Design a protein with these regions (language model features):
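Conserved acid/base catalytic micro-environments in cytosolic active-site loops
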Residues: 1-158
């Protein structure tokens, strides 16, 4: 398929475990992002905890978290950086979660030709994030989780 999957999770307790859990579910290498790591196709990249993630010149840049109190906005920070600095295809997906992280960057993703997807509210355990995303008016697809996977494959192949 030739895609990189970047998981930006704003839950601090879970994120450090994802790089240990996900290899059981994918043949792609799963990597915890470090400063200066190059973005490569056919890899899954996981943001480390308590860091903002940026991309510049095809490499990941980590900075101290810019919002240390309340719900972090690490998804918004990364997607804004992606919209500004990435020249390839972008597919941004917002799934179940608290608060509205990511929503403020979706129109920027669309403005550079990216595709945006939100999880269907009735399939989300915590619909705040997909609801905030949908309310922006900058969502191309609203799908159940199993349909999100199929849509990503179709978009990546097309």
């Amino acid at each position: 398929m030739g895609v990189a999957i970047i998981i930006v999770n704003h839950l601090r307790q879970v994120v450090t475990m994802l790089h240990e859990i996900l290899p059981s579910y994918t043949a792609m290498p799963v990597v915890l992002i470090s400063e200066g790591l190059a973005l490569k196709p056919n890899h899954v990249f996981i943001i480390p905890e308590k860091r903002d993630l940026h991309i510049r010149d095809g490499v990941f840049r980590l900075e101290p978290i810019s919002k240390p109190r309340g719900w972090p906005d690490v998804i918004t920070v990364f997607m804004c950086s992606l919209a500004k600095h990435w020249k390839g295809k972008i597919i941004a997906v917002i799934v179940s979660g608290y608060d509205g992280d990511g929503a403020d960057a979706l129109c920027a993703i669309q403005d550079v030709g990216g595709i945006t997807i939100a999880q269907k509210l009735d399939s989300a355990a915590h619909p705040d994030m997909p609801m905030s995303a949908i309310e922006t008016g900058c969502i191309d697809f609203i799908l159940a989780p199993e349909d999100i996977a199929r849509q990503i494959i179709q978009l990546a192949d097309g």
